[in-house]
């Protein structure tokens, strides 16, 4: 897939995510573009893979390009960046008491804070979020 096709897929993925839930996430764009298989994403979320880049079907240059195009789309559409803390799924309590230990997930091999932040930043359409909230049926208490 050439860069032009990839840009189209990235922007389309972001548009659809924003319409459905009001925000777009890099991992979902990677899944939508075919760079990250859903099963590999789940393996990473459950802690079976050390870092996300290891299971992506693209080199680091292409991954960087995807993240850059997401930022370009976000700036053009005035989306608000929002950091999201990714933690491991399925962590069980040892004896059923106390809090579950929180295990942070790593996106890149290097673990560089800038790279990690760029993967963990979701882009929010505040106006669309308000529309979606208004469209939800109100529950009475």
Give each language-model segment a name.
Residues 3-27, 32, 36-37, 42-55:
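Positively charged, polyanion-binding regions of nucleic-acid-associated proteins
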């Amino acid at each position: 897939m050439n860069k032009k096709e990839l840009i189209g897929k990235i922007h389309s993925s972001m548009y659809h995510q924003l319409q459905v839930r009001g925000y777009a996430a890099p991992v979902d764009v990677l899944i939508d573009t075919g760079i990250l298989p859903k099963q590999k994403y789940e393996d990473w979320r459950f802690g079976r893979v050390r870092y996300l880049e290891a299971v992506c079907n693209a080199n680091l240059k292409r991954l960087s390009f995807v993240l850059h195009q997401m930022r370009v789309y976000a700036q053009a559409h005035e989306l608000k960046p929002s950091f999201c803390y990714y933690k491991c799924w399925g962590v069980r309590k040892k004896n059923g008491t106390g809090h579950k230990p929180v295990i942070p997930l790593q996106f890149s091999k290097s673990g560089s804070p800038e790279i990690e932040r760029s993967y963990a930043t979701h882009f929010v359409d505040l106006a669309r979020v308000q529309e979606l909230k208004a469209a939800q049926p109100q529950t009475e208490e």
